[in-house]
Structure formats: C-alpha cells, structure tokens
C-alpha cells in the first residue's frame, strides 16, 4: 500500500493546480449531502470522494454527519462525526512500520457563546476532537477563541485570539498519536501561516494566533494574523520527509496580511 502523509486539501482537491491562496471552489469526484432543518436544529449527513491528483490518487473517501443546535440566540452547540470507509494511504511510524488510514474515526464537539457577560459583539468559541482507529490510533485536536467585533460601525473591525493544539506522535508509545487533519483547509481559518502551513500543516503543533480584521469597502476585507508555532513532539514523521525530526520545540513565528476582494456574489 501507499505509505504517505495525508495530502493537504490544496494538493488533493480541486485538481493539480488549485491555487489555494486564491480561494478556489472545493470540488469532489462525488458528493452526497442531506440537510434537515427543524427550527433551530440542523442535521446534516454527507459522503465525499475528493478530486485528488490522478498520479497521487489514494482512493480516500469520507462519510459522516453534523448536528448543530442554536439553544438560544446567544448559545450554539454542535457535534461532528467523520469516518474513512476507504483509503489506500498509510501513516509511517518511527520504527519503520505503518498503520492504515482506512477505518479511522473522528468525533468533535463544539460550543459558541455570543455577547459574553453582556458585552455586545464579544464571543467565545471552542471545539475538541478525538480520533481513533481500533487500538492502533489515538489522537486529538482542539481550539479556543475569544474575540470581539463591531459589525455596526465603520469598517466593521474585529479582534480575536485563538489557541489551537494538534497531537503529535510519541515514539515511546505503541499507538499512533499524530492528528489527521482530514479535509481541514480554507484560507480564512485553517491555513495557519502561508509558509508554516506548507512545512507542518495542522498536526503536532500548538499555535497561538492574534487576528485583526476590517472592511474598508463592502467587497474588501483586510486580515492581519500573527502566529506563534510550537511543536508538541520532536518526532514529525508524517510531515515533510526533510523534517522527520526537529531540534527544538520552538519552530517559528509568522505574520500574514491578507486581502479578500469579492468581484461579485457569483
């Protein structure tokens, strides 16, 4: 079988020249989607067959569902389940072996609170995901955000802080513990640093992010991100082959300034 790190969505989706930083549409070879909405409750089921690059086709499919419930106008809770019914990919282990990606399961729960403590425009948000595959794999990831925005004012400014963490693999244990980011992506949220994303992706990392945004025009949004990256484990097998082992947990910082210009609603 193929022994490789999971391809990032910018490589495995939308064809061989997807142009991640231009925010192209996401495409799949096959998609099945069911949405059910009952008042403030939304239930979604899905099956996804990614449009992978033909030369690197891993035959990986995803199936699962989401449930979101707006408990009150200021409290929203939800959960997501994803499984991989088919995949030819495998994860490399420090000792030279590998474990299959097929059969992996992920369960995540999330919470969002708006206008916290009566402060208009404030919000707190968090999510935690557990990941497993029988007795061979145990991984996890999570994030927490605290922020404030002023949608009714000029330029609609916002300021937020996010801490995110993704488990790495400890070579001293029998289980594989490096988090699989699945189809995580999207320039707005989970491309954590234009350079660092290419090097490390969303695995084996603690990431601090401070973000400021503004809308100087109706179709233009400016976003400034400040990142600090810390590796959880010095073993990074599963990322870039040249970085299988790190010398330090402190891997770097990055500042990103991005402009999003919407030409039209289409």
Question: What residue spans do the PLM features occupy?
Answer:
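Substrate-binding cleft and catalytic face of glycoside hydrolase catalytic domains
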Residues: 1-4, 8, 42-46
């Amino acid at each position: 079988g193929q022994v490789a790190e999971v391809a990032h969505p910018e490589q495995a989706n939308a064809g061989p020249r997807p142009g991640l930083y231009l925010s192209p549409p996401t495409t799949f070879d096959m998609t099945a989607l069911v949405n059910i909405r009952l008042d403030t409750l939304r239930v979604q089921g899905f099956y996804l067959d990614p449009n992978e690059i033909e030369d690197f086709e891993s035959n990986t499919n995803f199936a699962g569902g989401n449930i979101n419930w707006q408990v009150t106008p200021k409290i929203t809770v939800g959960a997501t389940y994803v499984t991989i019914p088919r995949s030819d990919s495998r994860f490399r282990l420090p000792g030279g072996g590998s474990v299959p990606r097929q059969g992996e399961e992920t369960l995540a729960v999330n919470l969002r609170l708006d206008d916290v403590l009566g402060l208009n425009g404030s919000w707190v948000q968090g999510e935690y995901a557990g990941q497993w595959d029988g007795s061979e794999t145990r991984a996890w990831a999570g994030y927490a955000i605290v922020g404030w925005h002023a949608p009714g004012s000029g330029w609609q400014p916002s300021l937020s802080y996010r801490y995110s963490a993704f488990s790495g693999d400890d070579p001293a244990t029998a289980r594989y513990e490096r988090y699989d980011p699945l189809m995580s992506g999207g320039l707005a949220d989970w491309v954590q640093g234009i350079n660092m994303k290419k090097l490390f992706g969303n695995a084996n990392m603690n990431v601090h992010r401070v973000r400021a945004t503004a809308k100087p025009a109706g179709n233009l949004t400016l976003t400034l991100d400040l990142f600090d990256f810390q590796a959880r484990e010095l073993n990074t097998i599963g990322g870039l082959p040249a970085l299988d082992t790190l010398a330090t947990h402190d891997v770097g910082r990055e500042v990103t300034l991005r402009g999003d210009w919407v030409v039209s609603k289409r």
